[in-house]
Amino acid sequence: MILLLDIGNTSIYMGISDGKTIIDTYRMNTEIEKTPDEYYATLKSFFDITQITDLAISSVVPRVTEAFKKIGHKYFHKAPLIVGPGVKTGVNIKTDNPKEVGGDLICDAAAIEHNDKPTLIIDLGTANKFIYVKNKTITGVIISTGIQVSRQALIGNTALLPDIDIITPPKVLGTNTIQCMQSGLTYGTAALIDGLVERIQEEVNEAFDVILTGGLSIIIQDLCKTPMIREPRLVLKGLLNIYLRNN
């Protein structure tokens, strides 16, 4: 079995694959100070670690990447595949500096390698990423503040605003502080998506599919006016495609 790891700034999204499909997924917090042995112990609490024979990693947190590299060498006696320079991805990158494009964006694009139609991937995470892919090429990206970061900014930089759960309030116009904040985060994100999709459409002047992914996509999808498909495992599917391309 292959352990797929998408290491983000807030959480680590994991999948177990038999090399054909993703069988199960798990999520744990990203903790910079955690040691390789501590991470390994956490992995064992999720699934039978003895079934794992290989690791594939996409990461935007170098320090945690190093921890999992050590796990690979110490416990599995092999180097994990890490998305980066020298790894065959099947994705071309048409940007000013391709090296600065994150592994998670590349995995998202690699997941739609069989889609011949231009596609906008919207990945809602610590940062919201809008990735335009055409002919297996990333041609442009938008990055905005993610919902959790916006929530933390509201709470941390104001004296009177309370902590809140990220849920959809009953109406767009709130009648109490909690609902007002929830509306700004949920309906505000949906409006951001709809507005940027419209502007991208004006710029590219062609029809494209829209795929929504990321941990909070389940909350946001129904609030958007834009027709879209939700694919929560997109980044792991792309990481699996990249792993198979290199093995």
Q: Predicted segment positions?
A:
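Short coil/turn connectors at secondary-structure junctions
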Residues: 1, 77-78, 116-118, 126-128, ...
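N-terminal glycine/serine-rich phosphate-binding loop of ATP-dependent small-molecule kinases
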Residues: 1-3, 7-87
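Adenine-nucleotide phosphate-binding core of ATP-dependent small-molecule kinases
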Residues: 26-28, 169-206, 227-228
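Glycine-rich phosphate-binding loop signature in dinucleotide/nucleotide-binding domains
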Residues: 48-51, 115-117, 203-206
